[in-house]
């Protein structure tokens, strides 16, 4: 049986990348929340 997670860099970056997050107000909210929490990785 084929597994559900078949990782590929491009689609991943396109949907969850930093630049995509910065495009919308809520995306920026996500980045700021992760900054405040002290996350090492802000986006993908």
Swiss-Prot record:
GO terms for molecular function: structural constituent of ribosome. Pfam families: Ribosomal_L34 (PF00468). Gene3D superfamilies: 1.10.287.3980. InterPro entries: Ribosomal_bL34, Ribosomal_bL34_CS. Disulfide bonds: none annotated. GO terms for cellular component: ribonucleoprotein complex; ribosome. Keywords: Ribonucleoprotein, Ribosomal protein. GO terms for biological process: translation. PANTHER family: LARGE RIBOSOMAL SUBUNIT PROTEIN BL34M, MITOCHONDRIAL RIBOSOMAL PROTEIN 34 FAMILY MEMBER. Belongs to the bacterial ribosomal protein bL34 family. This is Large ribosomal subunit protein bL34. It comes from Campylobacter jejuni subsp. jejuni serotype O:2 (strain ATCC 700819 / NCTC 11168). The gene is rpmH.
